[in-house]
């Protein structure tokens, strides 16, 4: 690991990347800036965005939900996680998520930050507001995963069509 730098970023600050898996990432603290200790990014996604079942062999992944709701599958157990909720997928544990709210804003922490090269390989700099709704490019996602040691794609998302709606709250 390298030497960490002091980092201060305000809301909206940071490098913005359109991710081939869907959504726009804003890098809040890069692996280079943290001496490789971690990668921290904000992810803005829309309803229906889902990840394939996957695992990170060398990184623990923590996702804090700032706004919105996700249906999360960690090692075969499915749970809904809403605002100010968190889920942790330790390295080597299969997981996936589905956005069930209209939009969601997530804070994603990967420790250590060695997986950043995968995200950069599967992303493009944001050039316009239209990038926020650009459709996923799953072929590019698979290609980037095959070149990376940071992620293993295990299969399709484990969610059914009827799970795409937000949880109903009692009246």
Model-derived regions, located:
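Short histidine-centered beta-strand/loop micro-motifs
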Residues: 29-30, 52-57, 98-99
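Ligand-binding loop in jelly-roll beta-barrel domains
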Residues: 34, 71, 91-117
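A contiguous, mid-protein "functional segment" used to position or interact
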Residues: 102-150
């Amino acid at each position: 690991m390298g030497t960490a730098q002091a980092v201060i970023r305000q809301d909206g600050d940071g490098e913005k990347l359109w991710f081939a898996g869907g959504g726009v990432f804003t890098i809040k603290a890069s692996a280079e800036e943290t001496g490789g200790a971690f990668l921290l990014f904000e992810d803005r996604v829309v309803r229906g965005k889902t990840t394939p079942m996957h695992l990170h062999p060398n990184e623990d992944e923590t996702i804090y939900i700032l706004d919105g709701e996700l249906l999360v599958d960690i090692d075969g157990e499915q749970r809904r996680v809403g605002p100010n909720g968190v889920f942790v997928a330790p390295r080597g544990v299969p997981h996936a998520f589905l956005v069930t709210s209209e939009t969601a804003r997530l804070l994603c922490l990967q420790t250590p930050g060695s997986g950043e090269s995968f995200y950069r390989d599967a992303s493009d700099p944001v050039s316009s507001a239209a990038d926020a709704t650009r459709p996923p490019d799953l072929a590019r996602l698979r290609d980037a995963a095959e070149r990376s040691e940071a992620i293993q794609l295990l299969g399709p998302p484990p969610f059914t069509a009827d799970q795409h709606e937000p949880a109903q709250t009692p009246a």
